[in-house]
Amino acid sequence: MRELQRLADQLERSWDGDAWHGPALGELTQGLSAAQAHRHHLAEAHSIWELVLHCTAWVREVSRRLGGTEPSLPLEGDWPEVGEQSEAAWEAAREALKEAIRGLARAVREMDPALLDRTVGEGRDAPLGTGTTFYVMLHGVVQHNLYHAGQVALLRKLA
């Protein structure tokens, strides 16, 4: 399997797939009501819904970077607000994350492999994910999804 295919596969597994780490974001968020997803179980901790919106924003930001956009915080914001709290809005948030991940995986499969060695942005800014290669950034977005999947798994137990 070529490297781009492996990266795309790992991205997709962060949403739904036979992942070694355990349940992926799709499985972890499936079957939750809007109220369960929006509940704040811990003071100063994000809700499951907020985590889904945050992951979506960053997956989209990485997609924009692959398309040639200069790195910045996501257009949606680092932690987008939930807004309407309906079942339809919750399902739309889940669907948006799934589609963002699938779209990024498609873009990775189609990208020029030479881009993997190019540097993202000008200087090192760890929270922004710059100053590393596209290869590291793509692994980083997978790691980011899985980090938050762990949080969702814990919050789901409290739901």
Regions found by a protein language model. Name each.
Residues 1-22, 26-29, 34-81, 121-159:
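Short, contiguous alpha-helical
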